[in-house]
Regions:
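Outer-membrane beta-barrel translocator/pore domains, especially the C-terminal barrels
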Residues: 28-32, 42-44
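Solvent-exposed loop/turn segments connecting transmembrane beta-strands
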Residues: 1-3, 11, 28, 37, ...
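Outer-membrane beta-barrel initiation region
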Residues: 33-37, 169
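Feature captures outer-membrane beta-barrel proteins of Gram-negative bacteria and organelles
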Residues: 2-21, 41-51, 70-90, 106-115
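Short flexible/disordered coil segments
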Residues: 12-13, 52-59, 82-93, 120-134, ...
Length: 169
């Protein structure tokens, strides 16, 4: 599929707003170049705010998901000085509890570990995982490897404040 994203993140501010749009097709079961008869246009508006102490990133997204359901996702992520990120999220959409099945809505926790912590040499790579109690169609987003906010996160107000404080120590 195709994906695009825009982000407005004023320098020195703790907030950012963005939008993404994705046109995707479902691949054939044999994983070759064919597609199934399913395509969807998804998109979300997002707002991010980074609280200063302790460093917590709050994100809210609203839009259309892969199952053509409409709703919102809310995330809170604690960012530790080591670069470790631990977060939780939940998604509420127009899919009824009866349609969604057990669990009623999508939810889970995420963990991101910088490989720098585990290796003897410097690395910018990160190992990330998301744990969900159940996988259902409702509330699922396109999995984009790296969004714009995460790409500029090291230049956020919280990161700059932390770096400056370390420089002065």
């Amino acid at each position: 599929g195709f994906s695009g994203e825009v982000l407005y993140a004023p320098y020195g501010q703790r907030w950012a707003v963005g939008a993404d749009l994705n046109q995707v097709w479902k691949r054939d079961f044999n994983q070759r170049l064919g597609f199934q008869d399913y395509e969807v246009l998804t998109g979300h508006l997002s707002i991010n705010y980074e609280f200063p102490s302790p460093r917590v990133l709050a994100t809210a997204r609203a839009g259309r998901y892969l199952a053509r359901d409409v709703g919102a996702t809310f995330e809170l992520t604690r960012i530790f000085e080591s670069g470790v990120r631990l977060g939780g999220f939940f998604t509420l959409t127009d899919v009824s509890s009866a349609e969604f099945g057990e669990g009623s809505f999508d939810k889970g926790i995420s963990l991101s570990l910088p490989l720098d912590l585990l290796l003897t040499n410097s690395s910018r790579r990160v190992s990330a995982m998301t744990l969900r109690p159940l996988f259902r169609d409702g509330g699922q987003m396109v999995n984009v490897s790296s969004g714009l906010y995460s790409a500029i996160g090291k230049y956020s107000r919280g990161s700059l404040d932390l770096g400056w404080n370390r420089f002065l120590d």
